Amino acid sequence: MPRVKRGFKARQRRNKVLKLAKGYRGARSKLFRSATEAVDRALNYAFRDRRVKKRDFRALWIARINAAARINGLSYSKLIHGLKIAKVEVDRKVMADLAVSDPRGFAEIASLAKANI
């Protein structure tokens, strides 16, 4: 069986990993094995946290809506229930933004929900 030296392709593969590890501290940006471990871990965290970010933002929106709803004499769950009965389809992202930037507008939505409970 002939000997395979794996010159170009192996170097190309290693350089790809080292390029991804650029900016890491110490050996993690210089040595292929350390860089591979660091890059694999970083990509796993990135994949996981793209999903966690969605959960975190939804929790933030709910906390903001709840705070604004309580100022208007409702709990979060009562507000959402009232809006469902009134057939108002405003998503939580928009409602949270409204609660922060336009409290009067949010108060109108809250009064609409209150009327339909």
From Swiss-Prot:
GO terms for cellular component: ribonucleoprotein complex; ribosome. The keyword Ligase does not apply. The keyword Manganese does not apply. GO terms for molecular function: rRNA binding; structural constituent of ribosome. Keywords: Ribonucleoprotein, Ribosomal protein, RNA-binding, rRNA-binding. GO terms for biological process: ribosomal large subunit assembly; translation. It comes from the Bacteria. InterPro entries: Ribosomal_bL20, RIBOSOMAL_L20_CS, Ribosomal_protein_bL20_C. CDD domains: Ribosomal_L20. NCBIfam families: rplT_bact. Binds directly to 23S ribosomal RNA and is necessary for the in vitro assembly process of the 50S ribosomal subunit. It is not involved in the protein synthesizing functions of that subunit. PANTHER family: 39S RIBOSOMAL PROTEIN L20. Belongs to the bacterial ribosomal protein bL20 family. This is Large ribosomal subunit protein bL20. It comes from Geotalea uraniireducens (strain Rf4) (Geobacter uraniireducens). The gene is rplT.
